[in-house]
């Protein structure tokens, strides 16, 4: 079997859904070079929320948390209308083909993060229902899976930890039962607790879902369909003259993802590497193109400089309040606060009396800064980006610094990291 994952940009409108159908049909009729037969009864389609739906649903959560119920309802109606328009363009009947939820699944007595998971998960539930019904009406053998009932997690809201053993058993049983349809459509990004609460796996977690399903079901391959030709050495929206990296090793992919490369979710590689399952990244608009392949046989190390931008960063610097500064103890205190406040660290630098950390600038940062101030003198700079250059040279580094305000830099033999003011 194979696993195909489609991101929100790929299914942002009716034309995207039609192209997904085309790719699915190609897969079902494809004479695979690996198994030398078409994929029969063996295609798992993992789908994210459509377009910018996740961002819109996050806005609903924020408005409700701020007590702005009317604005939240207006935003919610806009989200439903967006999906209804796509359904109608695809010839589907809202309300009969697909049941729409009128009420926002919000409980003011629950913590923010728990409400977040109940509301934001609606994006994937909507998109997959639309796609499953569309494929079914086009004559394909299709089944829709409700992943919150199948992918078991704990209740770490927004960063749920998957119960591998239980999830594997349940998913394998569902997949291996007699007369299962040829195509299964499942949500990425979301799972569920033992008591039926929906959870999310972290931003961009649909890739991780696809990798887990590939591992559980012993897939011959997992393919992520993107709006780019494959894995590039830079974001084409930010850097001109990008180069396709056709083949790379699991290790290189892990390093790129943890540096902030958004082409692959950081957790994606491990489940695939454990079973030596190749991961393909292919262009959604050109399904017959080769794209990129990540595997144990990948070519490495990467022989072109790779530019990775991580936006919306804040640089927090902590200075000792007195001279009784012990680095190890201070780091322990700092990372305890960072962990308790769910901050994502992208860079660390220390000196004799200061420690600086660069983190994603989320709503949790102000509380963390206040807690850090109880132990340290704290300063910070926001509106920053982190540029990581793998495979750098003095010439490349000098060019990267031109015209930019550098707040902090780190350089090793082959990697440079620059914290810069956002332009």
Sequence positions of predicted segments:
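Electropositive, surface-exposed helix/loop patches at the edges of structured domains
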Residues: 177-193, 256-280, 317-331, 381-402
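Short phosphate-binding/catalytic loops that engage adenosine nucleotides
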Residues: 140, 277, 343
């Amino acid at each position: 079997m194979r696993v195909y994952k489609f991101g929100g940009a790929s299914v942002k409108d009716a034309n995207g859904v039609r192209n997904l159908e085309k790719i699915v049909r190609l897969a079902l009729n494809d004479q695979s070079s690996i198994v030398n037969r078409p994929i029969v009864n063996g295609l798992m389609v993992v789908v994210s929320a459509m377009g910018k739906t996740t961002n819109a649903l996050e806005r609903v959560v924020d408005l409700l948390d701020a007590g702005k119920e009317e604005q939240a309802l207006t935003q919610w109606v806009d989200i439903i209308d967006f999906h209804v328009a796509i359904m109608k363009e695809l010839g589907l009947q809202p309300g009969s083909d697909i049941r729409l939820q009128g009420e926002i699944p919000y409980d003011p007595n629950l913590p923010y993060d728990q409400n977040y998971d109940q509301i934001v998960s609606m994006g994937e539930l909507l998109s997959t229902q639309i796609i499953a019904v569309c494929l079914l009406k086009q004559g394909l053998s299709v089944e829709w899976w409700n992943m919150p009932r199948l992918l078991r997690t704990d209740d770490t809201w927004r960063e749920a930890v998957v119960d591998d053993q239980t999830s594997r058993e349940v998913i394998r049983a569902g997949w291996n039962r007699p007369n299962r349809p040829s195509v299964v459509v499942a949500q990425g990004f979301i799972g569920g607790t033992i008591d039926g609460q929906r959870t999310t796996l972290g931003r961009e977690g649909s890739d991780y879902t696809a990798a887990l399903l590939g591992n559980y079901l012993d897939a011959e391959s997992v393919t992520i369909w993107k709006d780019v030709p494959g894995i590039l050495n830079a974001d084409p929206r930010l850097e001109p003259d990008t180069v396709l990296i056709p083949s790379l090793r699991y290790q290189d992919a892990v390093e790129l993802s943890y540096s902030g490369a958004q082409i692959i979710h950081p957790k994606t590689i491990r489940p695939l590497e454990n079973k030596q399952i190749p991961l393909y990244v292919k262009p959604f608009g050109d399904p017959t193109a080769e794209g990129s392949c990540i595997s144990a046989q990948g070519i490495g190390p990467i022989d072109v400089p790779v530019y990775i931008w991580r936006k919306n960063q804040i640089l927090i610097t902590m200075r000792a309040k007195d001279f009784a500064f012990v680095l190890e103890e201070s780091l322990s205190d700092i990372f305890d606060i960072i962990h308790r406040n769910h901050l994502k660290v992208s860079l660390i630098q220390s000196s004799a009396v200061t420690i600086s950390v660069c983190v994603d600038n989320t709503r949790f940062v102000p509380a963390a800064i206040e807690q850090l101030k109880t132990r340290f003198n704290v300063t910070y700079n926001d509106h920053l980006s982190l540029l990581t250059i793998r495979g750098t040279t003095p010439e490349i580094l000098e060019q990267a610094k031109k015209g930019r305000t550098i707040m902090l830099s780190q350089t090793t033999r082959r990697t440079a990291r620059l914290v810069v003011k956002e332009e």
